[in-house]
Structure formats: C-alpha cells, structure tokens
Amino acid sequence: MKRENPFYHRVPIQDSTYFFGRAQEVDRIAALIANGQSVSLIGPRRIGKSSLLSQLCQPLVQAEYGLVADAQTLVYFSGEAWQDQPTGVLYAAIWTAVVDGVAVVGTGAFPTDLPDPMVETLDFPTFQRALRQIGYPERRIVLLLD
C-alpha cells in the first residue's frame, strides 16, 4: 500500500508558519545535535527532509532547543547541484558556506591562517584543518548537508 505524501509544497518550506507536525522530529534532532551526535535523515523524495533541515536553521528554533551560537553554529549546504563537480570544488563551496554561517552569527574572531572563502578548490586536509580551526574550542560547526 502506497502512502500519500502529506506535503503539498513543491519546494522546501522556509517559512516556519507553514512548518508543522514535526515537533517530535525537531526535538529529537536538536537534542542529538546539542549532545554532539551525528544524525542522518533518510526518507523518500519530497517527504520534508530539506524542510526539516531548514527549520533547524531558524534562530527561534535554535534558541528554543538550546542550540546557541556561542556553543555551535549550524551551517546548511545543499549538494543538489554539486554531484558532477570535483571534490575540491565541493569542499571549497562548503567552506564558503561555513565562513558565511559563522559570519552571520558573529561569534568570535576568525583565525588569520584560514583559507580564503572565495577559493575555487580546496583539498580535504586543508578543509578539515580549517573546520577545526574555525570551530575549536569556542564553537562546534554543525554541517547540515542536504
């Protein structure tokens, strides 16, 4: 028996007004993130995974669940258009999203030896080292990879 998808939106829901019925999922995921756990959202296409990630990025939701910027910074990145790109280009794009996300919440100063956020390619060791430098020890960078 095939179930009907309850979501009528054709794109991920960005407006919290239209996001409802997922309080239990948001609560569970936020608790796992706050405790430093990794989380995987798995489900059929267009079931609301991207909308759920978008909801977690809302400042009011983060405040409600204790995901405060001085402890962790949530960074959303959609990989939808990146499947045919070399890994170095993907790492550079994620790095740019991280720098933008940290700049938006305005927590702490950036270390001076980080890669330029406009770099076009980034190898994995440099990407990994940069993530550690920008996040540790003041904050954890939480990547919400869609």
Q: Which role does the model predict for each range below?
A:
Residues 1-20, 25, 108-112:
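Conserved adenine-nucleotide phosphate-binding loops and their immediately adjacent elements
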Residues 30-36:
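Phosphate-binding P-loop
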Residues 31, 58, 62, 96:
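Short, well-ordered alpha-helices that flank and scaffold nucleotide-derived cofactor binding pockets
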Residues 36, 47, 81-84:
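Conserved nucleotide-binding/hydrolysis micro-motifs of P-loop NTPases
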Residues 41:
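Hydrophobic anchor at the beta1->P-loop junction of P-loop NTPases
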Residues 44-77:
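P-loop NTPase Walker A phosphate-binding motif
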Residues 74, 79-109:
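Conserved NTP-binding/hydrolysis module of P-loop NTPases
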Residues 100-145:
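Mid-core helix/loop region of P-loop NTP-binding domains shared across ATPases and GTPases
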